[in-house]
Amino acid sequence: MKWALALLLGLACSWGRADTPSFSLVFAGDTTLDDAAGALIARGGDPLAAVASLFDNADVRVANLECVVATTGEPVDKNYTFRAHPQVLPVLRRHLDGVTLANNHSGDYGRAAFAEMLGWLQAANLAQAGGGRNLSEAHAPWLVERAGLRVALLSYNEFMPRSFEADHDAPGIAWSEDEQVVADIQRARQQHRADLVVVFMHWGWENETTANGRQRQLARLLINAGADAIIGGHPHVTQDVELYQGKPIIYSVGNFVMKETDNDRQRQAWVLRMTFDRAGASGFSTHPVRLDDDGIPHPDPHRQSPCWRRGQGEPGLCTH
């Protein structure tokens, strides 16, 4: 009789684990498709082919699209401007479900080109966070429902000088105004009934491998407001990771597709995989990639990189 009871209890526990809803997200960093990568696509190639397996079996696959995808517009007055042809989008859609747009290159060719890009993304069935035809759209969450979980994805730019933010009647990106971001997180929880909130930040200083005080202060503010995880980019190098109140902060995953690199550190990056359940983030792994001379990513499996599972304490290092 005791063995039968034990068997029933074991089955009940296994059923409970099977019924626990879970969600997985893969995020890749700064992605420009205007240069060698765009030329490769024009020839029928795929710049993401070598790392395609890193996106396998994820519920949502995301990258930071750090170029405007359009055929119109004129370059603004700045050192670097990036514009890719819409022909890149089918290849992007092959690997991704959506992109983040809140960065300092979405406005490289002006508002009309940005609005054109929004149309191309929609036509390609690529979702986006952090951009819109007006202020409300730019701050609206990208909502994903998987396995009984509703997940809100938000994206913000904090790279100064403050520019190209959406207005009530003008397309643009979501700017990281503290009070507004807190309100957006709370709205995602209350109005959109999100079980989980993930915030993507474009922040920090280029080539700095350690997050600065402002990044740490803001990450804590957003977690206190209700975010379950913070994922960052813009420095073009990887930065440190940490837990705050048991919630992961990945300050920068580095580049993903980027020919314009200044040093070897900018060619070393991570593709992040993070898992969630109803209680929040349950773990993450960072998969090292290395960019070649054309800015195309390739696996770099022998390099250690941060990883973590709930219950283990602070993040450690893993080799994949």
Description of each model-found segment:
Residues 15, 19-320:
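Acidic, metal/ion-coordinating pockets
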Residues 4-12:
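Bacterial N-terminal signal peptides
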